[in-house]
């Protein structure tokens, strides 16, 4: 994994995966898309979508545990505070050789700079909410969200996906 390359690609994802509008119906469509991907691949994930602190979609697939929802909450807190994907925040901290505690005094009980939460971005407005997935390795959580967003926004996934680690 090349940190700089991944951070550059995530910045591109955040620039291109933006909505013109987003409401409760949009949250349902996005959440349903994520759930369908999880069902097709037999993934045990929790999905949470919120806008302005209001939970609009929550789903826990078979095989998940309450801990998955807590991880989603902690990743969501990072995105809400930093206005960047939780994976980008974590990779930047890794690159800088620091942590959330050292950099911002944030308690790990409430914040997790791990992949799996992406800002819901409105063009011309910025971050209005989050979409979180928990249950897979962090890179996979992040990529699943990007895949669902790219499909919904009719963006070319091959231009946005992170490089394959294999």
Swiss-Prot record:
InterPro entries: PduO/GlcC-like, PduO/GlcC-like_sf, YBR137W-like
Recorded superkingdom: Bacteria
A Pfam short name: HbpS-like
PANTHER family hit by this protein: PTHR28255, UPF0303 PROTEIN YBR137W
Family: Belongs to the UPF0303 family.
Protein name per Swiss-Prot or TrEMBL: UPF0303 protein Avin_29320
């Amino acid at each position: 994994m090349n940190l700089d390359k991944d951070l550059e690609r995530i910045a591109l994802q955040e620039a291109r995966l933006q909505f013109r509008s987003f409401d409760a119906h949009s949250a349902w469509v996005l959440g349903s898309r994520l759930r369908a991907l999880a069902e097709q691949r037999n993934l045990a994930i929790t999905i949470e979508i919120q806008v302005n602190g209001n939970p609009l979609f929550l789903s826990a697939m078979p095989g998940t545990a309450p801990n998955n929802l807590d991880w989603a909450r902690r990743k969501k807190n990072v995105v809400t505070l930093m206005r960047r994907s939780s994976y980008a925040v974590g990779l930047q901290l890794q690159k800088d050789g620091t942590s959330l505690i050292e950099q911002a005094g944030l308690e790990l009980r409430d914040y997790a700079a791990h992949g799996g939460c992406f800002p819901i971005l409105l063009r011309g407005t910025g971050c209005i909410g989050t979409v979180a997935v928990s249950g897979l390795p962090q890179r996979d959580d992040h990529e699943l969200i990007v895949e669902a967003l790219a499909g919904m926004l009719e963006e070319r996934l091959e231009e946005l996906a992170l490089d394959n680690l294999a």
